[in-house]
Amino acid sequence: MFNPVELEIELFCRGMRIDASCEVEADGRRLARTRAGLGSGLELMLPAPRKPIWVNVPVVERFAEASPLRLIKDGFGYGVLDERDGAVYPVEVPEEPAWYSRLTSSGVPMCRIGVLQGNYLGVYVSNACLFWASKPPRACRFCTTGKNLGVNEQPRKNLEDVVEVALAARDESGSVFTHLNTGYHFEDVDKLEPIHGLRQCEPFVRAIRERVGGFIGVQAFPVPERLFCEYDALIEAGADHFSFCYEFEDPETFARLCPGKAETLGQEGFFRAMEYTAKKLGPGRVSGEIIAGLEPIEATKRGIDRIVAAGAFPTVCIFRPTIGSDLENAPPPDPKAMRDVFAHLWEACRDADLPVGVLPIEVSLVVQAEETRDLVKPTFGSRLYDWKLAALRQVARPYVAWKRRPRAA
C-alpha cells in the first residue's frame, strides 16, 4: 500500500475514475476550470498522520479514463480503490461552500470570481494573459487561461466583488490566504506600466489588506530590474508573498513550451525578480514555481536547487495535460519519477533550513513541501528539522491571528 504522500502523487499522475456509487455533485465541490486550468479536478482530503492532505485529482482529462484508481462510496463514506491490488484508501470529499452559489452585490456568482483550491482562495484578477492575443499565440503550451476566462470565470474582476468573495471565504471557509494572479501584460514595455500585472493587483491587495485581512500572495509576470519599484509598491500595499512561474530549468524545454516568456524576459528575468523580493520579504515569503514531468528529471532537480539558492522555496507542480491545452494529449508523468523529484524537494528544503508548512495554508494543486518528508528515510538531521518546524508552527499562531485582522497597509 501507499503512504499518504505516495497516494497523492499517484492521484496526480494517474488521475481517477468516479464510480456510479458516488454522488460527488451533491457531496463535493464543483470542478473549477479557472485560471490556468489546474483546478480541473475533484477536491479530496487524504487522511495523514500529521494533518489531512488536500489534492485536486484529475478526473476529466483523457488519461484519467484509464486510471487504475477509482473513487467509490459505501455506507462508511468515500474511498479510493486501487484495482491493481484491491487496496482501498479512505478519503473525504469536502463539501462545496454555500457561498459558491451566492451572488455578489453586482450580481455575479461568487464562484466566477474566486474558488478555493485547498483552503486558500485563488482569484485571477485581470483579463487573459496577453501572450494569448499575439499572432501567432505565444502562450505557454500547457496553459488554458485564455480559454477559461470569460467561460468558467469572469474575464475581469470588480474590486468590490473580490472583496465580498474574500470575506465569504474568510468567514465561512476559514481561508487565511488570498492568492491573486495575472498573466503577461507588456511588463517589458516601460510606457505601459499602468497595465502591468503588478500594478493591476495593487488596488486589490490594498483593499483585501484593509477590509479582509489574512495573508496575500501575488503571482504576476516579472518586471525588469529597472521597474522593481512595482514590487516595493505592492509590499507597501500589503502583499506578503510573491510567486514566480519560471516553469522549467532546461533551456530547450523552456523555449519550446514557454515561447512568450523566453522571448521577453527569459529565465534570468524571473530569477532576478525572485532574488530581489526574497531579500525584501525574507525566508519563506517567495516561491519559484516549476513543472515536473515535461523536462528531464535531473533538470527539475537542478531547478529546485536554483530556486533555493535564490532565497526562495520551490513549488513543484506535477504536469497535468489539461483539456484545451496544446499538450492535452501528452502522457502524464511517471509516479516513480515524481517520488524521486519530491524526495529531492524535501532534502533541498531541509538542507537550506527553509520554514515550510509553518502557516495553516493548504494547497490542493501541488504536493506541498512539508508533505514530502515521508518520501525520505528519516535521519537525525531530518528529525531536528521537523522539531524546528513544529516549534515554528506554535510560535506562528499569534502572528497568524494578528494577520487575520484587517488593517491599514
What residues fall within each predicted segment?
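Catalytic alpha/beta core domains of metabolic enzymes, predominantly
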Residues: F270-L294, G303
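Core AdoMet radical
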Residues: T144-E164, A169-E230, L234-A273, R285-S287, ...
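N-terminal [4Fe-4S]-dependent radical SAM core
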Residues: W54-R141, T145-P155, K403-A409
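Auxiliary Fe-S-binding modules of radical SAM enzymes
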Residues: M1-D82, K280, K301-A409
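Catalytic cores of alpha/beta
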Residues: E225-E236, A292-A310, Q368
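Hydrophobic positions in alpha-helices of CheY-like receiver
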Residues: F204-I208, M274-T277, L281, I307, ...
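Short acidic/His/Gly/Ser-rich catalytic and metal-binding motifs that mark active-site loops
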Residues: A133, D250-A255, I323-D326
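Active-site-proximal loop/turn and secondary-structure-junction residues that shape catalytic pockets
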Residues: V125-C129, Y184-F186, P222-R226, F248-D250, ...
